[in-house]
């Protein structure tokens, strides 16, 4: 597999980090999701949020400490490369000055409607488990 040059740009606080996450790493994330979906380890938002079918039809898989043996080997390089890009972004936008200690608690892989792809990460910032305002949103 060819190693493509990693490039980045930040404009109006929107960061683009090309080739930090490889196609192979994306495919591994999709494979983890699909395998866990087969074992009914994903969440259907229609059921757990009682959402109307026309509003939310996505499914989610949460990779965290409780199931690390399932996903770590497949997603380790994706997480490392993501962290490199995120640290660069936080440093160059001033985010690390405002929020010096970021901790990743879970990885959320979300499968959306057909043609809408997969949503790999978002970070919530706030206290407690309630719905807090989002600080950063990432799509891979």
What kind of region is each of these model predictions?
Residues 1-140:
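Fe(II)/2-oxoglutarate oxygenase catalytic core
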